[in-house]
């Protein structure tokens, strides 16, 4: 099925969870925030949050600096 990730389409298998998507992209950790269809999904829900065709996923990585 097709989902949008940071504005680009990506093919993922049916039943893909948010955790599986992040793992496949080598993204994760405490400095990452994710929203699906404009709603923030808490990290504790990533393993159970299944993606659906057409979902729009935005992944933001926070980087410290100064």
What are these regions (language model features)?
Residues 1-65:
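Ubiquitin-like/PB1-type beta-grasp interaction modules and other compact soluble beta-rich domains
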């Amino acid at each position: 099925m097709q989902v949008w990730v940071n504005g680009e389409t990506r093919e993922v298998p049916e039943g893909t969870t948010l955790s599986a998507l992040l793992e496949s992209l080598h993204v994760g950790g405490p400095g990452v925030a994710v929203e699906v269809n404009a709603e923030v999904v808490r990290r504790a829900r990533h393993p159970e949050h299944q993606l659906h065709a057409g979902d729009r996923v935005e992944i933001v990585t926070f980087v410290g600096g100064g």
